[in-house]
């Protein structure tokens, strides 16, 4: 194939939270004199996130919500489920946590991510982002010194649909003016990244640090990488084959 575009997922593909969410919520609550177990907060967060994603998909855009309000509600529900009712203290805490997760301080590069992006740049490949993140992503990428690698960023909020909806991939391909068979998508989610990209006609690779994924999914072993930098030899091979 002739390769012209690489699109990347972000969370747990290029960036990951520096400290588990429950620990971060606990630390902020402790500053305000609230006593709650970090493990309880972690479980409550997962339940609140899952519930809000089901009731108000894609940050509640169809229901007229903003992504900021969606996240504030998730935080409030997390503390309710942990036995702490709403108060001015929790409202203030929620706003602080929303702001904290907007900054590079709470995020770390996935090992091998920058090396992979540098290598793709050196290979002359265009790159973009397709992510289910919200409107904070571009600023976060800027703070993490990653924005320079990408021609554009497509988020679920800006596209109006979230992965695995094919519309978000079509939007990226349209912006790049590249046909799907000349594009590769890389991400850590089997359904949202690997399968959805292939359904639209793109090539895709799954980042899966644990082995063996073939026991879980029907996926060729050569389509699985354990870190972003493992993508590069595969791309080099594709580029060499396209020139012969």
Curated annotation (Swiss-Prot):
CDD domains listed in its UniProt record: HAD_dREG-2_like
InterPro entries: HAD-like_hydrolase_domain, HAD-like_sf, HAD-SF_hydro_IA, HAD-SF_hydro_IA_REG-2-like, HAD-SF_hydro_IA_REG-2-like_cap, HAD_sf
Domain of life: Eukaryota
Pfam family, one: Hydrolase
GO cellular component labels: nucleus
Family of the protein in this entry: Belongs to the HAD-like hydrolase superfamily.
PANTHER family in UniProt: HALOACID DEHALOGENASE-LIKE HYDROLASE DOMAIN-CONTAINING PROTEIN 3, PTHR46191
Protein name (Swiss-Prot/TrEMBL): Haloacid dehalogenase-like hydrolase domain-containing protein 3
Lineage, uppermost ranks: Eukaryota, Metazoa, Chordata, Craniata, Vertebrata
Primary gene name: hdhd3
């Amino acid at each position: 194939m002739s390769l012209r575009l690489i699109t990347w997922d972000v969370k747990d593909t290029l960036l990951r939270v520096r400290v588990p969410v429950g620990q971060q919520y606990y630390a902020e609550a402790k500053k305000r004199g609230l006593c709650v177990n970090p493990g309880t907060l972690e479980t409550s967060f997962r339940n609140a996130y899952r519930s809000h994603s089901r009731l108000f998909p894609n940050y509640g855009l169809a229901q007229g919500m903003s992504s900021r309000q969606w996240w504030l509600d998730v935080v409030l529900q997390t503390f309710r489920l942990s036995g702490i009712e709403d108060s001015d203290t929790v409202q203030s805490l929620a706003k602080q946590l929303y702001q904290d997760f907007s900054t590079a301080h709470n995020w770390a590069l996935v090992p091998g991510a920058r090396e992979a992006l540098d290598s793709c740049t050196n290979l002359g490949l265009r790159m973009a982002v397709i992510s289910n993140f919200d409107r904070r992503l571009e600023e976060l990428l800027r703070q993490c010194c990653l924005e320079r690698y990408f021609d554009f960023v497509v988020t679920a909020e800006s596209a109006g649909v979230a992965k695995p909806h094919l519309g978000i991939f079509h939007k990226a391909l349209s912006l790049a003016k590249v046909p799907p068979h000349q594009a590769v998508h890389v991400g850590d989610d089997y359904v949202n990244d690997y399968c959805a990209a292939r359904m639209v006609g793109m090539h895709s690779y799954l980042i899966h640090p644990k082995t063996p994924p073939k026991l879980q999914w029907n996926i060729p072993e050569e389509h699985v990488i354990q870190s972003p930098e493992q993508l590069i030899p595969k791309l080099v091979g594709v580029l060499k084959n396209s020139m012969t």
